[in-house]
Amino acid sequence: MGQMDGGDGGGGGHPYHYQALLAAVHQQTVPFPNPFPAPSSGAEPPHPHNHNHNHNHNHNIHNSHNHNHNHNAAPHPCHTPTPTPTPRGFADWSASTSAFTSLAAHSSTAPSNAVHYSFSPCYAFWTHYMLNKNAYPTSFPAPHDDHLRLANNNHPRDAPGPASSYGVESFTSPSMAPNICTHMPPIEGPISAKEDKKPEILPRVVKSSDELETRNSNVEFHSETVGTLPESKQGHDSRATKLLNSGEYQVILRKELTKSDVGNVGRIVLPKKDAEASLPPLLQRDPLILHMDDMVLPVTWKFKYRYWPNNKSRMYILDSAGEFLKTHGLQAGDVIIIYKNLAPGKFIIRGEKAIHQQTTNP
């Protein structure tokens, strides 16, 4: 950077007007001019002629000379100076501030020989706002309108290349943007119609009233429950008599219960002779499941039929009989009777209370 050479009438060397002004603003050594009009004086100063000459002399490929000439010449003697309006503060900065704004906003990315000063963002934005203050709106629409407008607008920061305008969108730093940005709702992207969510299909739980659980797995109900036991006992004699008289079923086993039979274990020891003669043969020690219909209740009982070795002999046991004994209220001294249908091989079991004869003293 040099001083102005003599040209077009000569003149002394002066530093660049706009560069000196920018440096003074950056260093805060010169106060800002008064924005109000200055009082007019009686004598009108001569109108200066501002000649800005930018000469780029490329003498060769390696050497480049940049001469910037700026001088204030005296009024030409051939014409009479015309009166100029009173300075209006920032209006006289038209030549300087245009360069100032272009340097501050860095609107052009093309290489140039101009010297770029490192200006503070606050000065750059202040000058930009004073020059373009008419571009900012004085009122803002409702928040929901701003949201729709901003959501559908293309963001300048997404576009490639330099900023195309000096609006608020060209400032990416929050400190350089005006306070109006705080009143705008956040931009969450374009508004799209929400997809209808498919209703969740929950697994259907099906409960059957016919399936009833008992405390033991050895009981199967047909359609009635044990609560019908008192009513069913009314036809006990008639049904038993009918079955016996029909000849389809015959008694194959009769056992008087002992204290060990009605214990908590629920295990009934069967007579060896009757068990081997009428019940299915046991070839292994593994239990055999026997299904027996109740004589009184519409229930099918599942018993485990097994044997225990006993001194080169066998002891036959009807296991899992605790629920059957409890349902009929059988105690020691009562009797169980097992019936068998010879043709299909079905079994029927019956519990009978013992009859105690009471003797009275004379």
From Swiss-Prot:
Entry keyword set: DNA-binding, Nucleus, Transcription, Transcription regulation, Ubl conjugation
Induction: Up-regulated during the early stage of iron deficiency (at protein level).
DNA-binding region: 253-355
Modifications the protein undergoes after translation, according to the UniProt entry: Polyubiquitinated. Ubiquitination leads to its subsequent degradation via the proteasome pathway.
Gene Ontology terms: cellular component: nucleus
Top-level division of the source organism's lineage: Eukaryota
Chain segments carrying region Disordered: 30-91
DNA-binding among keywords: yes
Cellular localization per UniProt: Nucleus
This protein's record includes keyword Cell cycle: no
Protein name: B3 domain-containing protein IDEF1
Organism: Oryza sativa subsp. japonica
